[in-house]
Regions:
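Alpha-helical, largely C-terminal catalytic domains
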Residues: 1-399
Length: 399
């Protein structure tokens, strides 16, 4: 499903403005909200496993998040209170229309994916705990946004009702371990605040673009593309989850250093390595202390050498090839990550950001050079069985 129609549909979420009936600062897009939600989901799920011994299906957590993202991308112009009431009364009919719209707007969408999506939405007891965690993550991401705009809207009709609705929904999720912890504004809450700042770091900051995208939205798109690549490679569930989470967290250090563009990193010999060492030190000092110690190894695994093909054997990181991962390590216990495929998704995301803006007639020298260089780099290129060259060929050259 790594096709032009699907990728363009994902980027539609970068156009959708949230809270547009409220006084608000800029930067609240549906894409960013969905990315923040998935990072919060990770925190909730890990705490639920650690504190309550929950047996969670991480692949279903990720797929559920993708299903809900696609659904909201079709329906999100509907005001939240109206949306939830419509789903309560006409949920089956609305979802049937969503499936129809997805098939119309993404002609090459895979039928087995659609069948899983229908199962997810039409059977309430299917993966009930995973749905509960995603629902809590949704309201926590919404609450994070609303707290930022609340003081702009105090006294405006309806703002107190909105606040009460969000708080009541979260109260219904207090049986989840992390929801209580987050309400106390402890370390986990500070982590969610910190990663939330990725919403405000703009990509291609030196150039005007439409749509504007943030580092936060970018990482979710890389994660989703990484998920579909892993499925195409026939990856086991653990490998699929690893590729998604690595895509989701690969730019986490940039919340501390900001998005240092590749030409700057390459401008001085050794500068790229220096930046990496600085990022590692700052992650250790600023991010890891906000998370339980038992999570540190995984966070470092997702953020260090993020684009290397690797597995973990007896607690040690071993660098390898995608071919060897597929033949020897495509099973639980090795925590395989297809780093070079994720690098391909990362570059594809950068390319599409520029291509979309130039299609709308907004361009710059930086964007023209960037689009040309990335397209040339991936001409006829296949990575681990993923034909990235074919994907680029679907995007026509803009003169």
């Amino acid at each position: 499903m790594l096709t032009k129609s699907f990728i363009e549909f994902l980027y539609d979420a970068a156009h959708i403005q949230r809270w547009n009936e409220h006084i608000r600062p800029s930067g609240f897009t549906e894409l960013d909200k969905q990315a923040h939600k998935m990072m919060i989901m990770y925190v909730l799920a890990r705490h639920e496993e650690d504190d309550h011994g929950a047996q969670l299906n991480w692949r279903l957590l990720i797929e559920g998040g993708i299903f809900e993202f696609l659904q909201r991308n079709v329906l999100t112009d509907i005001k939240p209170q109206i949306f939830h009431e419509m789903m309560r009364v006409y949920g089956k009919e609305l979802n049937a229309w969503v499936y129809q719209e997805l098939r119309r707007r993404i002609p090459d969408i895979q039928e087995d994916f659609m069948e899983k999506m229908q199962l997810y939405f039409e059977y309430p007891q299917y993966c009930a705990m995973e749905k509960k965690i995603l629902r809590a993550a949704h309201y926590l991401a919404t609450k994070w946004e609303f707290e930022l705009i609340y003081h702009f809207n105090e006294g405006i009709y309806g703002s107190e009702d909105t606040k009460a609705v969000i708080e009541n929904e979260l109260e219904d999720h207090y049986d989840l371990a992390a929801v209580k912890k987050l309400a106390l504004k402890g370390k986990s809450s500070k982590f969610i605040d910190l990663v939330g700042q990725l919403r405000f770091q703009k990509r291609w900051a030196q150039s005007p673009r439409v749509p504007e995208t943030s580092v936060m939205g970018h990482v979710l798109l890389v994660a989703i593309m990484g998920y579909f690549c892993a499925v195409k490679l026939g990856a086991c569930d653990e490998r699929i989850v690893g590729d998604f989470l690595c895509g989701l967290f690969h730019d986490l250090p940039e919340v501390l250093t900001r998005d240092i563009i590749s030409p700057v990193k390459r401008s001085v010999p050794g500068l790229d390595e220096l930046i990496k060492r600085m990022e590692e030190r700052m992650v250790a000092e600023k991010i890891l202390p906000l998370l339980p110690y038992t999570w540190h190894e995984d966070i470092l695994y997702y953020t260090q050498d993020e684009f290397s093909n690797r597995v973990r054997i007896d607690g040690k990181v071993v660098h390898t090839s995608i071919e060897e991962i597929s033949s020897k390590y495509n099973k639980p216990g090795f925590h395989a990550i297809d780093g070079s495929v994720l690098k391909g998704c990362d570059n594809l995301s950068a390319f599409v950001e520029v291509w979309l803006s130039r299609r709308y007639g907004i361009t710059s020298k930086h964007m023209e050079e960037g689009e040309r260089a990335i397209r040339e780099q991936y001409k006829n290129k296949i990575i681990g069985g993923i034909d990235f060259g074919r994907v680029y060929d679907e995007f026509p050259i803009i003169d």
